[in-house]
Amino acid sequence: MDNPTDTAGKCPVAHGNKPRGPSNRDWWPNQLNVQILHHNSGRADPMGKDFDYAEEFKKLDLDALKKDLTALMTDSQDWWPADFGHYGGLFIRMAWHSAGTYRITDGRGGAGQGQQRFAPLNSWPDNANLDKARRLLWPIKQKYGNRISWADLLILTGNVALESMGFKTFGFAGGRADVWEPEELYWGPEGTWLGDERYSGERQLAEPLGAVQMGLIYVNPEGPGGNPDPLASARDIRETFARMAMNDEETVALIAGGHTFGKTHGAGDPSFIGAEPEGGAIEDQGLGWKSSFGSGVGKDAITAGLEVTWSQTPTKWSNYFFENLFAYEWELTKSPAGAHQWQAKNAEASIPDAYEAGKKHLPTMLTSDLALRFDPIYEKISRRFLENPDQFADAFARAWFKLTHRDMGPKVRYLGPEVPAEDLIWQDVIPAVDHPLVGDKDIAELKAKVLATGLSVQELVSTAWASASTFRGSDKRGGANGARIRLAPQKDWDANQPAQLAKVLGVLEGLQKDFNAAQTGGKKISLADMIVLAGAAGVEKAAAAGGTTVSVPFTPGRMDASEAQTDAHSFAALEPRIDGFRNYVNDKRLQFMKPEEALVDRAQLLTLTGPEMTVLVGGLRVLKAGQPEHGVFTARPETLTNDFFVNLLDMATQWVPAAGKDGVYEGRDRKTGAAKWTGTRVDLIFGSHSQLRAFAEVYGQADAKEKFVKDFVAAWNKVMNADRFDLV
C-alpha cells in the first residue's frame, strides 16, 4: 500500500480562512467538547429526512453497475493513466483505505459512512492520489445516483477490481448510507503529518489509536520510523492489525492478497509533489498532490516514494507474492525517491514495467512485506499459503470481506443479492425470531410479576442499562439484543456488578422459564426481551412513586445468542473503562480520557444528543443505577424525579474537592458547612459546563417534572432499542 512521505512535518491543521477570530476552543482548549453529539444531525443532509437509502438500494441493478465498473477498470484516462492498463490495484487500495481506518477499541473509523471523501482522511498522506480513484468513479456515481451511496460504491469497486482480475470474492453487502460532513474523531495527538508522538515507553501505542503515525492507515511500509527492520515492522503490523480486529492469519492474507496486485509509486523525489486536496488551490477542484516531476502521472507518478511491484502478473490473481518472497534473498536498496525498499539478489528481471511493454524489472518488496517471512509466526502462515494456494485464496476472501464489512453490524443490515449465507462469528450473530411474540396482555402480566419478585428499582434499571448501553453506533455492535450480558465476558465485567447481575438474571430467567412453559402455540419471551421489559417495569414504578404515571414503550423481538455465537475476545473491547452514566471508573485500567470526556464519548457512541445525555444522567442518578456511591442528589432514591438537577443547581450548596479522593467532590451547605452530597466530575460538569448547565436548568425548573419524566423515558427507550435494526 502506498503511503507518501512528502508531507512529513507539515501541519495537518488548516489555516488561512480569514477573516476569523479565535474560536472558543482556541481560548479554552480544555473545554469539554459536546458538539460531537450533534454532528450529522440532518441539517447538513441534502437528501431530506424522508430519504430511505435501503429502499433506494433495492432499486439498483447491481449486475449493470458491476458491468460498468468492470469496463472502467481498463478504460485508462490520460489525466491519470492506469498502471499496466488496469485500475484494479488503485481501486483495491481505495477500498482498503476506506475500510482500514476501523479500530476495535471504540468501533470508529471504517467504510460505513464514506468518510474518505472528507477531511482529514481525503488528505492523509497514506491516501495520496486516492482522490483520482474517486474522480474516476464519478461518472458511474453520477449515472446511478441515489441508488448507490459513495460509501457502498467505494467498497463494491474494490470487490469488482478483485473479480475483474480473476479473484473470487466472498460476497458483498450494501447498506452503508452516506453522511454529509466529516466526523470529529481523535486520530492522534500529533500536529504534523507522519508524527508519532502517540508512543510511550517500550513502543506502547496509545489507545484508541490503530495506526503508527498521523495520517497512516496502519504501518510505515519502510519500517518503524523509516527503519528498514522487518522484525520490528512485524511487531507494528501485529499491533495495528489486532487493533482492527484481525488475527495473524487474516493479517498475512490481507497483506499478501492486496500486494498481489498493482504497484507503488516513487518515480521521483517527494519535493515535486504539491498540496493535498484540502490545501490545494480552488482551481484544482479538490484534486491534490499535483506533481511537477516529468508528466506527473503514469511512469512519473509519485505517491509513497516507494517503487515496488510484487508480482509477475500484477493484474491477475496469483501466488507470486509468496513465491517471490521465499524464492530470493533480499538486499536493502532505495527507490528513485530515496525510500528504503528491498531488491531480490541474484535474480532475473521478471517483473513487468507498468507502461513500457517488454521492459522488465527485478523483484522488489517492502520492509513490511519481508516481515511476513522473517517473523516466525507470520512465516509459518506464509509458507502454508505458499504451499496451499487454495487456502490462501479462501483466507484472503474471508479477510477482505471482514475488512470491508466489519463496521456494518449485524447481518440484518446487509442488503443485496451477494450477501453470503454463511454466518461469521465476528458478525455477532443473533438467531432469527422463530416463535410468536408476547402481546400487550402478556407484557402487562410480566411487568406485574417482575415487580412482585421483590427486585428493587435499582436492580431492574441497572441490569437493563448494563445490557443495552454496550451499543456502539460506530460499528453497530453491542446492545441488549442477544442477551450477551449473561455470557462471558460481560457477566464478569466489574462495571456490571457481577454479584448483583447474577442475582437479577437468575430471577428473570425463572420468570422467563415459567412463562414460556405455560404457553400454548409456541409463544415465548427471550431473556433479552425479559431484561428490557423488567427495566421498563422499574422505570414505571419509579415514575409512579414520584407522582407521574407513564408507560415505558416495549417492543418484543429480541433473541438470545449462544456462547458459540459469541467471540468473547472480541467483546472484551466493549468493556467500559469509564461509564459516566453509571458513575463508574475502573481504577485498574489505563484511562485515556477524563471521566466527563468519556461520558460524552459514550453518549456519542449511543447516538444520543446533548439533552438526551443530560436527562439520562439525571434519571439514572436518582434511580441509583450503576455505582450509587456518588451523585445521588435526592432524598427519595429510586424515585424518578428531577431532584438531581434541582440539588446540583442549588446555590445553597458549595462544592469542594473531597480530601484524598481524586475526582470526587463534597457538596456542603454554604452557611453551615454541613456535608450534603458527594459527586464526581461527571456529576459536576452539568453545573460547570455552560451548555450542559443550560440543559440542566431546563430539567431543574419547577415546571419540568413531567417533561423530565417524559424525556427520560424517550431517551431510555432509544437506548433500549438502539440495536433493533429489525425495527427500522
Swiss-Prot record:
Binding-site residues for heme b, renumbered to this chain: 259
Cellular component terms (Gene Ontology): cytosol
Modification note: Formation of the three residue Trp-Tyr-Met cross-link is important for the catalase, but not the peroxidase activity of the enzyme.
Transmembrane regions listed in the UniProt entry: none
Stored Pfam families: peroxidase (PF00141)
Sequence segments annotated as region (Disordered): 1-26
UniProt KW keywords: Heme, Hydrogen peroxide, Iron, Metal-binding, Oxidoreductase, Peroxidase, Plasmid
Required cofactor(s): heme b
Catalytic reactions of this protein: H2O2 + AH2 = A + 2 H2O; 2 H2O2 = O2 + 2 H2O
The enzyme's E.C. designation: 1.11.1.21
Molecular function per GO: catalase activity; heme binding; metal ion binding
Per UniProt, location of the Tryptophyl-tyrosyl-methioninium (Trp-Tyr) (with M-244) cross-link in this chain: 96-218
Similarity comment text for this entry: Belongs to the peroxidase family. Peroxidase/catalase subfamily.
Function of the molecule: Bifunctional enzyme with both catalase and broad-spectrum peroxidase activity.
Subunit and interaction comment: Homodimer or homotetramer.
NCBIfam families recorded: cat_per_HPI (TIGR00198), PRK15061.1 (NF011635)
Protein name: Catalase-peroxidase
Provenance organism: Rhizobium etli (strain CIAT 652)
Gene from which this protein is expressed: katG
